[in-house]
Amino acid sequence: MPQHGRHAPRRGSMGFWPRKRASRIYPRIKTWPKIEEIKPLAFAAYKVGMTHTILNINGERVFTPVTVLEAPELLVIGAKAYKKENGALKEISSLYFNDLPQYVFRKIPKLKNYNFEEKKEQFLSKADNADEVKIIVSTQPWKIKLKKTPEIFDIPIGGSDVNKKLEYALSLLGKELSINDVFKEGQYVDVIAVTKGKGFQGVIKRFHVHRRQHKSEKGVRKVGAIGSRGPGRIFPTVPMPGQMGYHRRTEYNKLIIKIGEPLNVEGGWVRYGQVIGPTILLKGSVPGPRKRLIILREAIRPPRKQEKVEGIEYISLSPKN
């Protein structure tokens, strides 16, 4: 307890525990909203940078920082059928399309000799008993000259009729999904990404612990005490040095300001280059550095009072440092 008589809450939130590195550079999503419309529940885009705009919100001119995302089309490369067992979904069958770009084989080499027609019959026979259907999508970073190896992940389909969802998933095989097929302007989405990695950091930067006085014993940038149980048994709430950043994080209810043509600043975006594909403007900030994949999900708990953007008066295209 502090001895100065003022309120001093403990440092760091146990809501973000354990503070360890994410298992991969793009996130896995386990929680999805339920909607009636039959459509994919998520999309993916690459973070470009930030700029500022002047928006007309509820009749007022509002200076608003926005994040720019580049969203090339997603390629639907397969479908998966799931069965509920003991309260969890278990995969019972999967199907992949046969005519795919060569870059997809970097991620899944076994698809080079995949017999689509034979696997399709097996998939349909097992999918009749499915409780859930998801599509398997691949990003296409080569279309925006970002890199060659794609990210591959599953996206659930909205709706309650499994047969209709299965039919919809099969109709998408081998086709491309655009951002306009999933989201629209003025809609709220959740953004899920892996944050910037900071490496191994001390308690001052990691937990914002105050520096000790200059005459303190055995160090200044350290915690004063680690508990009464001794160094052999330390509570998990005690600030300790360790990994900072590169964590999977979710931010709720980001407003889509605009979906449109490529948006470039003078001289190109710093540490990114020129935007080639469709652009998304999101109100506020987004986790992760430039070029990182951001998953946009249907808002799982949208706000009751929703802002209405009546127009965009100005978008800053000045060089960004």
UniProtKB/Swiss-Prot annotation:
One of the record's GO molecular function terms: rRNA binding
HAMAP family: Ribosomal_uL3_A
Keyword Ribonucleoprotein applies: yes
Gene designation: rpl3
Matches recorded under PANTHER family: 60S RIBOSOMAL PROTEIN L3-RELATED, LARGE RIBOSOMAL SUBUNIT PROTEIN UL3
Role, per record: One of the primary rRNA binding proteins, it binds directly near the 3'-end of the 23S rRNA, where it nucleates assembly of the 50S subunit.
One example of a Gene Ontology biological process annotation: translation
Coiled-coil residues: none
Keyword rRNA-binding attributed: yes
Identification of the protein by name: Large ribosomal subunit protein uL3
Subunit annotation: Part of the 50S ribosomal subunit. Forms a cluster with proteins L14 and L24e.
